[in-house]
């Protein structure tokens, strides 16, 4: 293994020790190492970093910017050991990512989605649990603020009914956290597990909470396809729409509803925001602030509080 490739591996291991997963980063930097070797250059130069980042030439600018970002961050690390390293300056491949505008689900939207899940047809005996699986999965996402991957990866051992707590492991940033459950959520999950034991008695018990009719962990593609089909069925998406409400938007709604309740209870949202950030599994409070944009209820409560402050001063 070349010295540069070894440096890449050491860098990845160091960052993973801090909780980052870096799967795409690792693939990108290994490819960049091969690119440097092909150009007979043992150290990073801005010129070669740009040349590598802009491959393939038909890719989107966002792809180029992401690739250059991998190299820039690694170059800062590498410069400590190799003073010949050039750190590509920021702004060489400017790109401002456009976040999808979140859909603010109403209570009625969620109720119709869950009802449609329970009404999904079952052709075979072994798939009779499927409606209940998606009813519970979508319901849990709507009341917990979990990421889809976190809910999908839940294991039976992660559900503590006595303490009314979920243990979320292997999260986006590699950290575990505890998420409390409401009594009604516990009741629904208990009922689901009872039905699961009845319908899957002949199968080997899966360690995962949400399983397919074959007893495996739910496939993420099937989850999205099911959600899209149900969304079109209840009118959240048009029959031919390729874009529309997403499952991740439930997380946004959970965060905004939490802040609205704080406003209505006359609590200080700025002081409590770090608590919500920890609950959601964010590393930085700024990551949580994104979820708190675009809500009419939030704007109304913020304006109400601002008007009261002005009244108190006059």
From Swiss-Prot:
InterPro entries: CB (IPR044068), DNA_brk_join_enz (IPR011010), Integrase-like_cat_sf (IPR013762), Integrase_catalytic (IPR002104), Tyrosine_recombinase_XerCD (IPR050090)
Pfam families, alphabetized: Phage_integrase
Protein name: Putative integrase/recombinase y4rB
Family to which this protein belongs: Belongs to the 'phage' integrase family.
Alphabetical UniProt keywords: DNA integration, DNA recombination, DNA-binding, Plasmid, Transposable element, Viral genome integration, Virus entry into host cell
PROSITE patterns assigned to the protein according to its UniProt record, in alphabetical order: CB, TYR_RECOMBINASE
GO molecular function, one term: DNA binding
GO BP terms, alphabetized: DNA integration; DNA recombination; establishment of integrated proviral latency; symbiont entry into host cell; viral genome integration into host DNA
Domain Core-binding (CB): 2-79
Organism in which the protein naturally occurs: Sinorhizobium fredii (strain NBRC 101917 / NGR234)
UniProt-annotated catalytic positions: 147, 172, 248, 251, 282, 291 (o-(3'-phospho-dna)-tyrosine intermediate)
Domain Tyr recombinase: 100-304
